[in-house]
């Protein structure tokens, strides 16, 4: 059995809100696998919430550029170390220039994009390095998404921290933008029910099964409870099954059917999702600056 460190116990406690002894017990049972420990704690009703999993720590902006015919678009996440720099005009100008060149060149990946030439003659990478030297913070081109369709692409930016692109068939740009706004707010996993990963469904089924057995109800009732909760879960994570944010009385799928439109695909970015950023002690930070 692997040694369970105090730091790992604290990490699980911070993510779940459970007691220290409970966290240690589940980490021992899962040989230190924190993700499996969270699943087991949910089954046992011990995990209050995975508090830390969705925490966005890194700074930066999302930028989108779209062609004039509304059929091609690109979306980028560009990171900085602080929100202050993310709002800096030099940083935002750089980000928008990179998005424009990405739309023009449609690079294969970030590395390819970094080698593209901007209107100034400098490559994206050279311009990035110059900006780092000027601003004094590390700047990173984190990810790039390209989208093309024969219909129309709508997009929505919530400030500069959340960006969504939606490819729509047989619909208007206004409808595509409304759907993009919905995706920004409701965070669906997939477009339709049949696209929900089998692994995700099975994980939820295991959790629901463990929870339902605690009810003491007959097995046939438990089976119905589990099926009902699985169906609810699938609706919650699929775009077409979600209540439409602008009119919760109808689902997105119903809205699209009324408009004779179809969502081909969507992409949602949120600044820093999945990144952990070191949380500095403010006093120590000031003292460090005084000492330098």
From Swiss-Prot:
Keywords: Cytoplasm, Elongation factor, Protein biosynthesis
Location of the protein in the cell: Cytoplasm
Main location: cytoplasm
GO cellular component: cytoplasm
Family per similarity comment: Belongs to the EF-Ts family.
NCBIfam families in the record: tsf
Protein name in the entry: Elongation factor Ts
Organism: Legionella pneumophila (strain Lens)
Gene from which this protein is expressed: tsf
């Amino acid at each position: 059995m692997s040694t369970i460190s105090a730091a790992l116990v604290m990490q699980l406690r911070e993510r779940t809100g459970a007691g220290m002894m409970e966290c240690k017990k589940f980490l021992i049972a899962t040989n230190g696998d924190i993700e499996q420990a969270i699943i087991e704690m949910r089954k046992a009703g011990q995990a209050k919430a995975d508090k830390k999993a969705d925490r966005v720590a890194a700074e930066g902006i999302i930028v989108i550029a779209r062609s004039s015919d509304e059929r091609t678009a690109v979306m980028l996440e560009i990171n900085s170390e602080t929100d202050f720099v993310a709002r800096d005009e030099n940083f935002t100008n750089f980000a928008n220039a990179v998005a424009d060149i990405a739309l023009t060149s449609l690079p294969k990946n970030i590395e390819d994009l970094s080698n593209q030439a901007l209107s100034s003659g400098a490559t994206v990478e050279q311009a990035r390095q110059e900006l780092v030297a000027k601003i004094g913070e590390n700047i990173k081109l984190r990810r790039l998404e390209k989208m093309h369709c024969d219909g129309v692409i709508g997009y929505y930016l919530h400030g500069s921290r959340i960006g969504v692109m939606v490819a729509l068939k047989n619909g208007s740009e206004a409808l595509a933008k409304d759907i993009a706004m919905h995706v920004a707010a409701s965070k669906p996993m997939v477009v339709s029910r049949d696209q929900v990963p089998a692994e995700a469904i099975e994980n939820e089924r295991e959790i629901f099964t463990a929870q339902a057995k605690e009810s003491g109800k007959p097995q046939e009732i438990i089976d119905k409870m589990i099926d009902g909760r699985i169906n609810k879960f699938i609706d919650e994570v699929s775009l077409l099954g979600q209540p439409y944010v602008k009119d919760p009385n109808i689902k997105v799928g119903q809205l699209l059917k009324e408009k004779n439109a179809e969502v081909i695909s969507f992409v949602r970015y949120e600044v820093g999702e999945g990144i952990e950023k070191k949380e500095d002690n403010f006093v120590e930070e000031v003292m460090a600056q005084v000492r330098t």
